[in-house]
Amino acid sequence: MPKEQFIIAMRFLASSVSVISTKDQSGNLYSMTASSVTSLTIDPPSVLVCVNNSASIHDALTTGENLCINILQKNQQEISNLCSSKQLESQRFENDFWDTSHIPFIKNAQSNLFCKVEETIAYHTHKIVIARVESSQSAKTFNTLMYADGGYLN
């Protein structure tokens, strides 16, 4: 299949916008906007995240480490844009969107899933991260930021 056909087809797969965040052993903070996040199992509660090998967060997502999947609300496009830009990783945390006291997470997100990495699988240009959800918190109403066809949905 030609690469271009696959890219066009995937543009029609609407999804919620998530930001993955973590802190490494040295205390460095990392985040990235993720387009490939999905639930894996309910028992145990687990998720799957795909991370490009060139992403700065890549090496911090290792077995046993903690991460947070922050599912964004409609009014959090700025956070999504910041975490998907080429800006230095440290600049992504120079605002009041975050609580960085433990596992960094976005305050006022639609949902936060606090996870521990259980397994990683290398697959061509990406790492598949399988993580067990240890706790979560969610807003009371549905107001999720959605993305499809190269842009945010209203």
Regions found by a protein language model. Name each.
Residues M1-N154:
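Basic, polyanion-binding surface patches
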